[in-house]
Swiss-Prot record:
A Pfam family this chain is assigned to: HMGL-like
Keyword Manganese recorded: yes
GO biological process, one term: catabolic process
Broad class of enzyme this protein falls into: lyase
Protein name per UniProt: 4-hydroxy-2-oxovalerate aldolase 1
Amino acid sequence: MTRLYLQDVTLRDGMHAIAHRYTADQVRTIAAALDAAGIAAIEVAHGDGLAGSSVNYGHGAASDADWIAAAAEVLTTARLTTLLVPGIGTIADLRAARELGVTSVRIATHCTEADISAQHISWARENGMDVSGFLMMSHMNDPAGLAAQAKLMESYGAHCVYVTDSGGRLLMSDVAERVDAYRQVLEPETQIGIHAHHNLSLGVANSVIAVEHGRILGDGPLGAPAGRTVRVDASLAGQGAGAGNAPLEVFVAVAELHGWEHGCDVFALMDAAEDLVRPLQDRPVRVDRETLSLGYAGVYSSFLRHAERAAERYGVDVRSILIELGRRRMVGGQEDMIVDVALDLAGREKT
């Protein structure tokens, strides 16, 4: 039986979809619904991780502590988890989250910068936390290079390492190649995870591919008995940056059809998506001309709303901004460059 570890990211990546404006009460309500539906883990933080609330990334409607405490009040079976980006959050922030009830953390770096996660992963492991490495913008490193970065995170103490498609740019073959590369280098006990975005409408398909390839140990052929648990990120109604993440309720329905062990009530997830999350979306989370441009150009999905504001302010097409950001290979943390790009494009149009 293929075993899945489903982690909901509605209350972290989903922050991007509503400009980090969840109230503590909304977090409490959504977390309770996810817990009742049987989800394994629920991630809670500002969209850019612990301590992400700032001028650069956007201020939250509440603090990380308020959001985490609200979720902790209602969870009965789901693991409370969070995300930390070294350089934004610190070990002190992680310690504070742990004291509030967080037992699991993902340490996120750019796909070529695993070495900056060493202290954070090691601290989490030494302090009894479940810890994963999270290699963002995975399309910007080739399979062998990405696997080498994953091996570094494993060496620091990560229980799991993710292929993280922050730009929604990976095709199904790209996911297969990267997961296969992970299998060749990671120890059998190290889990493999997938974090998909839906910018090319491949969020669910890419997650399925990751499971099919990631569940096999070593060089075993596809279809061999599953030997590894695969972690899959998803969110209610796809709530997340860009066109959103793999929609949780859709992925669980597909997993059910595959006969995979997921432990969730698909109807309860459908209800939570429709009744609790979709009404909060001031901008529909969907594939449209702007979010498709993110995936087409391979741009960090959380750049979307920043780019839309810059486009409106400077009178340029948001797609032009996104394509230029992709051409310049901008990555998470370079949000300030979005305005520079918009100004450059506006200047070109005037000359």
